[in-house]
Swiss-Prot record:
The lineage of its organism: Bacteria, Pseudomonadati, Pseudomonadota, Gammaproteobacteria, Enterobacterales. Its EC number is 3.2.2.23, 4.2.99.18. A zinc finger (FPG-type) spans 235-269. The gene is mutM. GO terms for biological process: base-excision repair. The active site is at P2 (schiff-base intermediate with dna), E3 (proton donor), K57 (proton donor), R259 (proton donor). CDD domains: EcFpg-like_N. This is Formamidopyrimidine-DNA glycosylase. The keyword Metal-binding applies.
Length: 269
């Protein structure tokens, strides 16, 4: 599933082609996504794009009459293409732009979303989200306070959007490795110093992934059709049985609630 770096990479890739241009119309080939494509999107006409923003894993297209909320789901990607390029099997939504380009949404598993809202504030998919991990609001003191009474393992807690947004399975595993913290540690057992280190590491890992265009493991593509290159720098995720790049110990993989966790027994305590 695309996580924060992949969504931010998409935002940065599409923004120059959308802001200042006008959506002439939308083409919805298959509106049966995770939630049905909002009726307002079918009727879009002559709408200038004012901004392209991101909140958590949601892309937000600001128009004069409201907002398009896009979620990439499990396998979605957005590409900027020439308008004349014919769609392929899993190309479900196009925004046809005044500059001769089309924003094309591809989603083989159809678990993404295209929603419309007049006002962002209070929308149900955005209403209960925690702070952005790259913001000043997310820091060691905040993390320690939120972990203090939490009787759950630190990894699933990091992936809870009420704590912090956008830190999914890949980046939770990578950040915990970089901080030397075992993923099964109780959140409440982390010291303030460990929380400060973990908060710094999460920011660094996410920023590095954004620099590399995100992580492509299967479906994700950048807006220019290229894969994300952070997969080449993964330390533990997807490396079961391979030697740890630090100590040589084989990487361990476990599964809880259908999610795989990767870690090094030697480096993470």
């Amino acid at each position: 599933m695309p996580e924060l770096p992949e969504v931010e990479t998409s935002r940065r890739g599409i923004e120059p082609y959308l802001v200042g241009a006008t959506i002439l119309h939308a083409v919805v080939r298959n509106g049966r996504l995770r939630w049905p494509v909002s009726e307002e999107i079918y009727r879009l006409s002559d709408q200038p794009v004012l901004s392209v923003q991101r909140r958590a894993k949601y892309l937000l297209l600001e128009l004069p009459e409201g907002w398009i909320i896009i979620h990439l789901g499990m396998s979605g990607s957005l590409r900027i293409l020439p308008e004349e390029l014919p769609p392929e099997k899993h190309d479900h939504v196009d925004l046809v732009m005044s500059n001769g380009k089309v924003l094309r949404y591809t989603d083989p598993r159809r678990f993404g979303a295209w929603l419309w809202t007049k006002e962002l504030e209070g929308h149900n998919v955005l209403a209960h989200l925690g702070p952005e991990p790259l913001s000043d609001d997310f820091n060691g003191e905040y993390l320690h306070q939120k972990c203090a009474k939490k009787k759950t393992a630190i990894k699933p807690w990091l992936m809870d959007n009420k704590l912090v947004v956008g830190v999914g399975n890949i980046y939770a595993s990578e950040s915990l490795f970089a901080a030397g913290i075992h993923p099964d540690r109780l959140a409440s057992s982390l010291s303030l110093a460990e929380c400060e280190l973990l908060a710094r590491v999460i920011k660094a890992v996410l920023l590095r992934s954004i620099e590399q265009g995100g992580t492509t493991l299967k479906d994700f593509l950048q807006s220019d059709g290229k894969p994300g290159y952070f997969a080449q720098e993964l330390q533990v995720y997807g490396r079961k049985g391979e030697p740890c790049r630090v100590c040589g110990t084989p990487i361990v993989a476990t599964k809880h609630a259908q999610r795989a966790t990767f870690y090094c027994r030697q480096c993470q305590k």
